[in-house]
Each structure stands twice: as C-alpha cells, then as structure tokens.
Amino acid sequence: MSHGEEKEPGIPQKVDSIDEIFVGCKSWVLKDGQDRLAEILSINSRRDPPKFYVHYEDFNKRLDEWITADRLQIDKEVIFPRPKELEEKKDSKKKKQQQNKSATPQAASATPDGGDVMDLDNLNVQGIPNEDISREDEIKKLRTSGSMTQNQNEVARVRNLNKVIMGKYEIEPWYFSPYPIELTDEDVVYIDDFSLQYFGSKKQYERYRKKCTLRHPPGNEIYRDDYVSFFEIDGRKQRTWCRNLCLLSKLFLDHKTLYYDVDPFLFYCMTRRDELGHHIVGYFSKEKESADAYNVACILTLPQYQRMGYGRLLIEFSYELSKKEGKVGSPEKPLSDLGLLSYRAYWADTLIKLLVEHGQEITIDEVSSISSMTTTDILHTAKALEILRFYRGQHVLYLNSDVMKRYKKLKNNKRRSIDPQKLIWTPPVFTASQLRFAW
C-alpha cells in the first residue's frame, strides 16, 4: 500500500457474545482505564477462559499483549474485516493501476548530472524505501543482513514468550522470536546469562548452570576500562552462541528477521564485570564485508540495562572501530525508533563538539574523516540542528546560540565515553573462502 492510500475500513456490527469475534476483527479494549481500539491477532482457545492477543491502533507493537475476554467491550460495535472476495477484486484492480503507472515513461531529470547533486530537503537517514515491494521482488532482493525489514506479513505478529528470566532479571519480551515451539507453552523461559542457552524449566536451567563453565562471551576481549569490556565474536566460529544471541535480541527488535545464518557477521558484545563473570549488556553486529559501507547491522541494549547510557557507548565504540579501519560508516537502515533517537543524539553531539573545538574553517569531508560519520549523516544532522545555511553560493555550517548552549551542556556532562587508548584491536582480514556462506 502506498503512503497516499487509506486502508479500506471494516464493517462495524453489534455482537451478542465473545464467540462471534475472530482473528482480524477490531474491538474496543479496556486498557489503563480507557477504551482503545485493538485488532485481534490471535486467540488462544486452549486456555479456559480463552485469551486474545491484541494490537492497539496507533500504538507501537511492543505494547501488544494477551488479554482476557472481560477486557473486550462487546457492548460497543466490533469492526469485522471485509469479505475476502471484495478484497481480492480490489487488490487485482490496484495491481493493474500500478502496472499502467510503471509503463508510463518518467520525465527526465532537470539536472543533467543528477547523480552528483544531493537533495538536502529529502535526505532519508532512515533509509526506508517509499515504494511497495511484492513478495516475489522481496525474495529476489533478500540478502544475508542483520537487520533487513521484511514485509509485515512475513514477520510473525504474535509475541510467543510471556516472560524471560535472565540472571537476576525478570524481563517481559516485546516481540515474537522463533524459539522452539515447546517453549511457547511455558509461563517462564530461563536464559543463561553467559551462554544464552534457553530452558523451559528452572530445574533444567539449574542443572545446566552447575555444569557450564563459560563466564564471558566466547571471543577475544578487545577493550576494557573500569566500567565495561568489549568482546569480538566471529559468527562462523561460534555459531550456536551467536544464534542464541540473535534469538534473544529478536525478542526486543521488531525488524530483525534473519537469525540463522550468522557466518557473515562479527558480533561486538559489551559486558559488565562482577565476581561471577562478564554479563552481557548489549551488542552490535557488523558484516565482515559490507558493500554499502555499513559499520553496524544490528544494535541492541538489553531492556534491563536501557536508559543508563550503554546504547551511546555501543554507538561510540562502533565509530571507534571505523576510525581504526580508516573508513567512514553508518548503521544499516531502517533503524528502530529507539535506535534512530540514539543515533541522532550521538551524531548531533559529535558534530557540535567537533565544530566548536576545531575553532577554524573545516569542510564536510574533513568532518567525515575525523568522525568516521558519512557526509549524508553529517548533512542530515546539520539540517536537524538548523545550522546549515546557504551563503554566497555555497552551503556553510553556522554555529548559532542554541548550538553553543548545547555545547556548554555537553562540557558539563560527566557522561562516560570510550577511551581509544584502551582499544587493543587490529581490523580483521578475511579470505574469499572465509566470507563464503556456509549453507
């Protein structure tokens, strides 16, 4: 569906009982003392009374939940989906219209060298394509990527685990993750803090914990300060551990869809140390060979450690690796909503600090070289900060009073940061056979 089109509304009807409601209907649901419209995504009739899995209209998917029947407001009209025959006719009509549209030749660009001109008003840092992609086209375009979004229909919409216990933390998952189906009937799933192995019962977990000797991610420790450590793990060498990490992260990342083939990736895990060992706080993955110059494929801070500044450390560390490699980089798009906010804040603070402390004229390319940020990300950030001006026939960066105030705040902020001197790392080099996917 294109952005300009509205989805056809359903058919509102009164119902006499809960039994008339099925998957695809929209009903009013009592949430936090208010009635909210929600779509029924799944019904669990194995339980008595049955439970309904709902998605609230205009709310993020992470708020989807299982509810009991008493929260459904059946005294109000229920919106039923339109009959399938009507939908199919409408879809075929749309397809014909799209085919006719694509057959119409497009007007030539008014700019002769359009490839060298950057449209500053339409910089798309989120990287989400605007056109619709059919299932067949999507499969053709599919590549082994850590965070590629697939069509909504291809991603399971029902969260399948209710609760996860990881170390001393009890966590409620946000999204579906393809754990073994036998775990989905368990009220609680136990995940080992070090090996990330999963268990359906506490007894199984405790027996495993007595035997397992792993106390840190199974890779090389490449960074350590008095606060955090970073480990580099090769997906090809540690497949089981990396797959477990991807399954865990899928619980909290909506558009992470490829989790099985970890061979083409390196994983950089941030940990906190205590007397028991290194506990994973967050991670980012990175393609061993990225054709698009991405320096991050997936990035996640586990929910129990969010809002503590760890996400920013992960982002900063990814750029420190890019500096060591002598490359510019950018995260793979699209970013999650939380990821985009974190990156925008990091880009803005980095750009402001660099411009103020440099103290003299500097080009965008020089800013890119020093920070390892791409010119697109720099321009997008400058535009968001409203410091990009057109002066005497060229674009210049103008430091206004708001930027100077933000810089003073940055200077007074005692935020933790990565110490480049403590990064003991040489960029890995891979042969063609090492980069080959192991199918």
Swiss-Prot record:
Its main location: nucleus. Residues 83-120 are annotated as: Disordered. GO terms for biological process: DNA repair; regulation of transcription by RNA polymerase II. The modification N6-acetyllysine is found at K256. The record marks C298 as: Important for catalytic activity. The active site is at E332. GO terms for cellular component: histone acetyltransferase complex; nucleus. It is an enzyme of class 2 (transferase). It is found in: Nucleus; Chromosome. Autoacetylation at Lys-256 is required for proper function. Signal peptide: none annotated. Its EC number is 2.3.1.48, 2.3.1.-. Acetyl-CoA binds at A297, C298, I299, L300, T301, Q306, R307, M308, G309, Y310, G311, R312, S336. InterPro entries: Acyl_CoA_acyltransferase, Chromo-like_dom_sf, Chromo/chromo_shadow_dom, HAT_MYST-type, MYST_HAT, Tudor-knot, WH-like_DNA-bd_sf, Zf-MYST. A zinc finger (C2HC MYST-type) spans 189-214. Keywords: Acetylation, Activator, Chromatin regulator, Chromosome, DNA damage, DNA repair, Nucleus, Transcription, Transcription regulation, Transferase. GO terms for molecular function: chromatin binding; histone acetyltransferase activity; peptide 2-hydroxyisobutyryltransferase activity; peptide crotonyltransferase activity; transcription coregulator activity. Residues 23-73 form the Tudor-knot domain. Residues 156-427 form the MYST-type HAT domain. It catalyses: L-lysyl-[histone] + acetyl-CoA = N(6)-acetyl-L-lysyl-[histone] + CoA + H(+); L-lysyl-[protein] + acetyl-CoA = N(6)-acetyl-L-lysyl-[protein] + CoA + H(+); 2-hydroxyisobutanoyl-CoA + L-lysyl-[protein] = N(6)-(2-hydroxyisobutanoyl)-L-lysyl-[protein] + CoA + H(+); (2E)-butenoyl-CoA + L-lysyl-[protein] = N(6)-(2E)-butenoyl-L-lysyl-[protein] + CoA + H(+). A motif (ESA1-RPD3 motif) lies at residues 239-260. Catalytic component of the NuA4 histone acetyltransferase (HAT) complex which is involved in epigenetic transcriptional activation of selected genes principally by acetylation of nucleosomal histones H4, H3, H2B, H2A and H2A variant H2A.Z. Acetylates histone H4 to form H4K5ac, H4K8ac, H4K12ac and H4K16ac, histone H3 to form H3K14ac, and histone H2A to form H2AK4ac and H2AK7ac. The NuA4 complex is involved in the DNA damage response and is required for chromosome segregation. The NuA4 complex plays a direct role in repair of DNA double-strand breaks (DSBs) through homologous recombination. The ESA1-RPD3 motif is common to ESA1 and RPD3 and is required for ESA1 histone acetyl-transferase (HAT) activity and RPD3 histone deacetylase (HDAC) activity. Component of the NuA4 histone acetyltransferase complex. Belongs to the MYST (SAS/MOZ) family. This is Histone acetyltransferase ESA1. It comes from Kluyveromyces lactis (strain ATCC 8585 / CBS 2359 / DSM 70799 / NBRC 1267 / NRRL Y-1140 / WM37) (Yeast). The gene is ESA1.
